[in-house]
From Swiss-Prot:
Cellular component, GO, one term: cytosol
Location of the Helicase C-terminal domain: 241-388
Subunit structure: Component of the RNA degradosome, which is a multiprotein complex involved in RNA processing and mRNA degradation.
Motif Q motif, residue range(s) on this chain: 9-37
Name the UniProt record assigns to this protein: ATP-dependent RNA helicase RhlB
Binding site for ATP: 53-60
Length: 423
């Protein structure tokens, strides 16, 4: 980790509860990141905060630290079964990741977290909640289910967190969020925090209706995409696109990379060619069962898979370290998704590489993306003669519950030729 990624403010300089501080120090957290340095002095003082910073800058630990501190220092129904904090996320994967990140603080403080998300695990989640939780982490739909059934009451809530708030609004969760917030104590009687990599004025205005005179903090990046991310753009024909991807993978030799495409079927095509070419590759799309998703992410995080092919379900909030490369096989239709996609690399002060394809189908999305990020993406040329020959792709068998979403190989690669890139 690069030293200039951190601020000059130490966690020990903050008025943190001693159990929270001890947990952070034991984990090796000494200096705050910039977003933590700006937001924590306010949230620890009980002020509502809306924080905007790029992905991988410590937003999750900023609101978790404030949440645990608040529950430990404020009067409340300690030891009760109903939650005292509510953390809402737009996706199941992000909710699970937040819960995992909270583990170091739950272990040190004795506070309990519980998960509430759709898809599967209903009975397991219900059992944990009925045994009593201090912090409920989940997606809006499942939390509303529990509230309407009378399983969860929100009248004891002291802290509310909306993570990736703009995404929650974009996905149409405004009514759900407001329903849940109306079940909580009034804004004046709770701490409310918003965090996201992008936070539009419209979203900020809507969100602030349910906050108490919030402070807005922003870490202004040198550029929206992060100055440690090397960006590169190719203009392949549809015919060359897959061969170019395979050639670049062999030339770049990424230690760990994510390849984004806009549709499930396109992701499956990419997975098929990469698996046939001997890559250790996983497939993450919206229809993959939750248990399988978590298994794939675990394999990817632990290094058993080198490549993850995904739709934008993986672009938000997932804390996967050491992703060296991101490929935009398709340019996203939403310009903000470009920022979130390539934000999977260059995290926590490390460098990263982003390679995008402006093909015949999605090149029209490029002007809006470059306008949003306020710079042109450097263009490279490729030598058609240097492209690899495509293997016969694997195909996913439909209707087979045991069909694999990952492929493993012991293949040792030999770089076949140079692509002769010209910048």
């Amino acid at each position: 980790m690069q030293n200039n990624y951190l601020s000059q403010l130490r966690f020990s300089d903050l008025p943190l509860h001693h159990q929270v501080l001890a947990a952070l120090q034991e984990k090796g957290f000494d200096y705050c990141t910039p977003i933590q340095a700006l937001s924590l002095p306010m949230s620890l003082a009980g002020k509502d905060v809306a924080g905007q910073a790029q992905t991988g800058t410590g937003k999750t630990m900023a609101f978790l630290t404030a949440t645990f501190h608040h529950l430990l220092t404020q009067q409340g129904d300690k030891g009760g079964r109903q939650p005292r904090a509510l953390i809402l996320a737009p996706t199941r994967e992000l909710a699970v990741q937040i819960n995992n990140d909270a583990a170091l603080l739950t272990k040190a403080t004795g506070l309990k977290t519980g998960l509430a998300y759709g898809g599967d695990g209903y009975e397991k989640q219900l059992k944990a909640i009925e045994q009593g939780v201090d912090i409920l982490i989940g997606t809006t739909g499942r939390v509303i289910d529990y509230v309407k059934q009378g399983i969860v009451r929100l009248d004891k809530i002291q802290v509310v967190v909306l993570d990736e708030a703009d995404r929650m609004f974009d996905l149409g969760f405004i009514k759900d969020i407001r329903y849940l917030l109306r079940k909580c104590p009034a804004p004046q009687h709770r701490l409310t925090m918003l965090f996201s990599a992008t936070l539009s004025y419209k979203v900020r205005e809507l969100a602030f209706e349910d906050m108490n005179d919030p402070e807005y903090v922003e870490i202004e990046p040198l550029q929206k995409t992060g100055h440690r991310i090397k960006e590169e753009l190719f203009y392949p024909s549809n015919q060359d696109k897959m061969a170019l991807l395979l050639t670049l993978l062999e030339e770049e030799w990424p230690e760990r990379c994510i390849i984004f495409a806009n549709t499930k079927h396109r992701c499956e095509d990419i997975w098929g060619y990469l698996a046939a070419d001997g890559h250790r590759v996983g497939l993450l799309t919206g229809d993959v069962a939750q248990k399988k998703r978590l298994s794939l992410l675990k394999q990817f995080t632990e290094g058993h898979l080198d490549i993850l092919v995904a739709t934008d379900v993986a672009a938000r909030g997932l804390h996967i370290s050491d992703v060296s490369h991101v490929f935009n096989y398709d340019l996203p239709d939403d310009r903000e998704d470009y920022v979130h996609r390539i934000g999977r690399t260059g995290r926590a002060g490390e460098s990263g590489v982003s390679i995008s394809f402006a093909c015949e189908e999605y090149a029209m999305n490029l002007p809006a993306i470059e306008e949003y990020i306020s710079h042109s993406i450097p263009v490279s040329q490729y030598d058609v003669a240097a492209l690899l020959t495509l293997p016969k792709p694997y195909r996913i068998k439909r209707g087979n519950n045991n069909s694999k979403n990952s492929a493993n190989s012991n293949r040792t690669f030999q770089k076949k030729r140079s692509l002769k890139r010209n910048f």
